[in-house]
Swiss-Prot record:
Binding positions for a divalent metal cation per the UniProt entry: D13, D14, S45, N98
Keyword S-adenosyl-L-methionine belongs to the record: no
Organism lineage string: Bacteria, Pseudomonadati, Pseudomonadota, Alphaproteobacteria, Maricaulales
GO MF: 3'-nucleotidase activity; 5'-nucleotidase activity; exopolyphosphatase activity; metal ion binding; nucleotide binding
Family: Belongs to the SurE nucleotidase family.
Reactions catalysed, as given in the entry: a ribonucleoside 5'-phosphate + H2O = a ribonucleoside + phosphate
Cofactor descriptive note: Binds 1 divalent metal cation per subunit.
Provenance organism: Maricaulis maris (strain MCS10) (Caulobacter maris)
Enzyme Commission number: 3.1.3.5
Pfam families, per database record: SurE
Gene name per UniProt: surE
Primary subcellular site in the record, as a coarse category: cytoplasm
Name of the protein this chain belongs to: 5'-nucleotidase SurE
First-level EC class: hydrolase
Protein localization: Cytoplasm
Cofactor dependence: a divalent metal cation
């Protein structure tokens, strides 16, 4: 359980200047007055769980409780907890609010989810928050949806003791607050990965280059998964964990390969 007036560490992958981080700070300040921010100096979307192993990390302090790090979300949470926040460690890590949904296999690319995952690995309850957009074509991002529902959902989570190896992934739909259908607790879904592709272009000098891009296509996911919930205008809440072992295959492999190593 999370204590009253918890110490909260905020991070993201869109960078210290991102609007979604401002939304997250508004959410956090509805829950506590002990809020700290350690976020990447520059955008780190798609960074996943990468660490900065080949470059020095530089910290810029905007004030006592607001800092940027010239690294990834994982770097930020690691340094925030171990080096930058004095006194007791945070009671809660919040990562987001991401500009765009983090659902299905996207969670493995996501720096937002990675920030929460690093907090979880350091023994701190952690939550990733993302605001879906792009389903209404040219409609603006509905930040007010995350802002309205973020704190009430987190308060409910405060009363839940979830396992130490689990983080909570919250995605808000591309709907105005009054049009949100409901909250659905979901499983991680699976999308058609052919939607992600390399888009070929030619620069003014005739040289080829590429941008990674998503085709504007929707899959047809089953009920009960995060994709379907977001498509249906629901808030998706998904428990994620680090153990990627596939249980059924593990048993099959033990029966086939367990014991004395084969020689032919």
């Amino acid at each position: 359980m999370i204590p009253e007036n918890p110490r909260i560490l905020l991070t993201n992958d869109d960078g210290i200047r991102a609007h979604g981080l401002k939304v997250l700070e508004k959410i956090a300040r509805q829950l506590s007055d002990d809020v700290w921010i350690v976020a990447p100096a520059e955008e780190q979307s798609g960074a996943g769980r990468s660490l900065s192993l080949h470059d020095p990390l530089r910290v810029r302090r905007f004030d006592e409780r607001r800092m940027s790090v010239s690294g990834t979300p994982t770097d930020c949470v690691l340094m925030g907890i171990q080096d930058l926040i004095p006194g007791k460690q945070p009671d809660l890590v919040l990562s987001g609010v991401n500009r765009g949904q983090n659902i299905a296999e996207d969670v493995t690319f996501s720096g937002t989810v990675a920030g929460a995952m690093q907090g979880m690995q350091l023994g701190i309850p952690s939550v990733a928050l993302s605001q879906a957009y792009g389903f209404g074509k040219d409609d603006p991002i509905q930040w007010e949806t995350a802002e309205m529902y973020g704190a009430p959902i987190l308060r409910r989570l405060f009363d839940l003791k979830w396992p130490d190896d689990v983080l909570i992934n919250i995605n808000f739909p591309d709907r105005k607050p009054g049009d949100v259908e409901e909250v659905e607790v979901t499983r991680q879904g699976r999308r058609d990965q052919h939607i992600l592709h390399a888009e070929h272009r030619v620069d003014p000098r005739g040289m080829d280059y590429y941008w990674l891009a998503f085709k504007g296509l929707l899959s047809n996911p089953p009920d009960g998964v995060d994709l379907r919930a977001i498509y249906d205008g629901k808030i998706s809440v998904t428990p994620l964990h680090m153990d990627l072992t596939h249980g059924e295959t593990l048993g099959n492999l033990k029966r086939m390969l367990g014991g004395v190593p084969p020689k032919s």
